[in-house]
Swiss-Prot record:
Substrate-recognition component of the SCF (SKP1-CUL1-F-box protein)-type E3 ubiquitin ligase complex. Residues 91-137 form the F-box domain. This is F-box only protein 36. One of its GO terms (cellular component) is SCF ubiquitin ligase complex. PANTHER family: DACTYLIN, F-BOX_WD REPEAT-CONTAINING PROTEIN 4. Pfam families: F-box-like. Disulfide bonds: none annotated. Transmembrane segments: none annotated. GO terms for biological process: SCF-dependent proteasomal ubiquitin-dependent protein catabolic process. InterPro entries: F-box-like_dom_sf, F-box_dom, SCF_F-box/WD-repeat. It comes from Pongo abelii (Sumatran orangutan).
């Protein structure tokens, strides 16, 4: 299953804690953890310092407490935990699926589960709030969608339409018909 993973599993950059101005890059590939740094200093003795790089296999990174400490210091404990999990072979396959496939999967979830999923990451929040998802949900829950309802959904959004009760929906459709009916009468 891991064979379809890209060569680069994770990449991030960061700056050292103050007062340091040094830059760091952490790159996790299928087989290695690559840690790069660039010393930034106004002092003349450090101006000729060349960038550095440390390459470790996943197994070696798991045993290298110094490199793990540096990773936690620069990038934070959550990034360190994520990298350790990648090194142990615990991949986040769900996060790597295409948006269309995820939208199809999410459309089968209960509303409470969609609300919880929305809180897990920025990507899932964007997907859970997308009109594409709510259009799928409305189509699966309604027998037929009239052209008037579809036009209203295009104006207000499918999510808004889904959470609108039937009485409000009828009133909004009536207002929309009156509005566009008046516009048609005014046209020569």
């Amino acid at each position: 299953m891991a064979s379809w993973l890209p060569e680069t599993l994770f990449e991030t950059v960061g700056q050292g804690p103050p007062p340091s101005k040094d830059y760091y890059q952490l790159l996790v590939t299928r087989s290695q953890v690559i840690y790069r740094w660039w010393k930034i200093s106004l002092r003349s003795e450090y101006r000729s310092t060349k960038p550095g790089e440390a390459k470790e296999t996943h197994e070696d990174f798991l045993e290298n407490s110094h490199l793990q400490g540096q990773t936690a210091l620069i990038f934070g404990a959550r990034i360190l935990d994520y990298v350790i999990n990648l090194c142990k072979g615990k991949f986040d396959f769900l996060e790597r699926l295409s948006d269309d496939l995820l939208l199809n999967i999410i459309s089968y979830l209960d509303l409470e589960d969609i609300a919880r999923l929305c809180q897990t990451s920025h990507r899932f929040a964007k997907l859970c709030m997308s009109d594409k998802l709510w259009e799928q949900i409305v189509q699966s829950t309604c027998d037929t969608i009239t052209p008037d309802v579809r036009a209203l959904a295009e104006d207000t959004g499918w999510r808004q339409l889904f959470f609108t009760n039937k009485l409000q929906l009828q009133r909004q459709l009536r207002k929309r018909k009156q509005k566009y009916g008046n516009l048609r009468e005014k046209q020569p």
